[in-house]
Amino acid sequence: MSFLPLCHAYERVLVYLYHFLGFSIYYAENLGTIAENIKEVHPTMMTCVPRVLEKMYDKLYLAGKKQKGIKKRLYYWAFELAKHYKLDDNSAWYNLKHKVADKLIYSKWREAIGGNFDIVVSGGAAIQKHQAAFFNAIGMPVFEGYGLSETSPVIAVSARGKGNRVAGTVGPALPGVEIKITAENEIICKGPNVMLGYYKDPEQTAEVIDKDGWFHTGDTGRFTPEGLLIITGRLKHIFKTSFGKYINPFLIEEQFCKSPFIENMVVLGENQKFAAALIHPDMIYLKDFCKRHEITYTDDASLLTHADVKAIFNKELKKFNPLFAHHEQIKAYELVSEEWSVDNGILTPTLKVKRNIIQQRYKDLIDKLFE
């Protein structure tokens, strides 16, 4: 199953691989029909981005709200169990519970998402560890990878075999590719996959490929003791407050986006006294919650200014803020009802938020946060 833009190196190279392996390729009609098309095609392999998996995860979570009594308790017991799945290191007790959950719950979920997946490649951004574990547990094997267009477009990827695929890591380096972590925690690499340079732009090329041939990715990361790469953020996105404290927005956003109420979030605060955020709620989940709790509103704008809705997000802040140092905690936020999408230019083709566009588009709202 293919649905990412073919102009993007990530999808294009994987399509070349499908052709090489003799696969039949089915193209989704559009992003909105992916779930429906998966049921029609029953694919064995798919390349995707974490945002698509997050939406599947959220839909499965929301579906449990329709259950009642013992069925509902069993549904969410299985849901929580899946989040703690380990590929090679589960206890005998966990495996027994997993076997029961698979018989009663996971088998139905697999059927709902095609029922035939053997490999799901996730790239373009980091997937949350508990979500990768969840899909592995229910029988939708997620293989995480990492790279850039400049690296053709992969430098590390999870692989079959004990210890080569661990949720939250992007696997070991590809054969023939060297990866190092600099003193600034930047990921740099060298290998035959690295580009020769930017077309007719030697100055920009020199900015990313040093004299020793190392390509500087601009991303930060670290290795596990077993040699698996973990992505921790984007070097240029790390900023400093007016008090000289560094903040990595990626780590904060990753935690807050575990909330079913939050679809996307951008942490701000460069040269400011504190960290703040623009939050795009998961409007489907939020509206369903309001319906179940009889919270009335007239439109999206009135929904996001409703006192009960504000209370919900204040509670989420109190839940996640303690996970961070005082200077990293979100002190102010604004809810944004406008959809963040590829069509309106806020998301990249791999569904990552364009921070510069956010800062331009919501300048007045951001200024208000720091008044």
Task: Please give the residue ranges for each predicted region.
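Adenylate-forming
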Residues: 194, 228-257, 286-307, 326-330, ...
